[in-house]
Amino acid sequence: MLRLTLLAVFSGLTAFAAAQPAPEPNPVLKALPAEGDPNAPSKAAPATASLDGPLPAAEGKPTGDDAVRLQIFLDQNHFGPGIVDGKPGRFTELAVLAWNEVNGHPSDDWHAVMEAARKAVPNPFATAVVPDSVKDWVDPGLPTSRSEQAKKKRMSYRSIAEFMSERYHCDVPYLAALNPGKKIYSLKARDSIVVPNVTPFHAEALVETKFEADPTMSARHVVVDTKINQVRIFEATPVALVVADPDNPNAAPVSRRGNKGLVASFPITPGKPQFIRFGTWELKNMVVLPWWRYDESLLKTGKRSSNALMIPAGPNSPVGVIWCGTSRSGIGMHGTSDPETIGRARSAGCIRLANWDAIRLPNIVRPGSTVEIR
């Protein structure tokens, strides 16, 4: 059973832009843990549409402010581009592909999504003030050894720069690039810096919570694609994409529709090949601020031992700020302490997402959903 701790520290952050401020975040839903039954039968997976077609062509890829604008737009619409850095790479291309799929555009089109991004994100940057809560959520002395971490109250951020970069869905080098002349590692409370104009991720607003089944969200289907490092979430029964005359199969389709069955997609880091458990499982529990059971034997061999440490909750926990366990014992989706490594490094066996993406999952899926790992 996962152990949890109640962390209910709230503080505000003033974020503002010269023309338009970053929007305030949606309320964070709540969750508690439940043990998954590894012997529970898996539900049959509903049919789901796949993201077919070529990735958007390189020649249409935006640069400069437009690149940041596009990444913010995709991020805010649940098509995660990875970290916001103004350098659209493969994850941004996959997010554009997903957005095009949903909206009925050619898979390799950049024009439609950029037009939408320019309308939705007129100002890609905002000015943010470092909140007073950093005094409780930044610990420069956070140890690296698991035995010492087990003695801590919380797995906090190691610097204000890390706190602010995760808050605004980017990494520290990009934050430094946006703020030339500022000593990004010497920030203090009430300092102001330029940040991507995204809805901020408020780690300090999270509390020990649990999520129950939901009639709509529990019927959805999660596809974890370990070949392209992406998780996609579908409605239980996607709508027909092509409307045609069944009595005249040789006739051209009447129309092509957007795939409204695709709900969201996010970049992931899958587990090491020897630990990946392919198949279809059930989402059993969703836990915010989980304590992590550090079992060296389990991580190295896949076999659970009785010699383990309990690592406290927090944004720098190896499982991040949320655990979404499946009916396959020990396998689940979770956050991470290193968002910049998503898609670039293997985890021990689970599916890692950036904390700002992982915490959105309870707004999209709930216990009872199927999780297909392929």
Q: Where do the language-model regions lie?
A:
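Secretory/export targeting leaders with adjacent low-complexity proregions
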Residues: 151-243, 265
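Extracellular LysM carbohydrate-binding repeats and other cell-envelope/extracellular binding modules
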Residues: 90-136, 174-211
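Gly/Pro-biased beta-strand-loop elements
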Residues: 205-334
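Exported/periplasmic cell-wall-interacting domains
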Residues: 300-374
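Sec-exported extracytoplasmic/periplasmic mature domains
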Residues: 75-79, 97-105, 165-183, 198, ...
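Primarily a LysM-type cell-wall glycan-binding module
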Residues: 54, 60-93, 132-169
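Compositionally biased, proline/threonine/alanine/serine-rich low-complexity intrinsically disordered stretches
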Residues: 18-63, 67, 125-127, 247-251
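Hydrophobic h-region of N-terminal signal peptides that target proteins for export
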Residues: 8-19
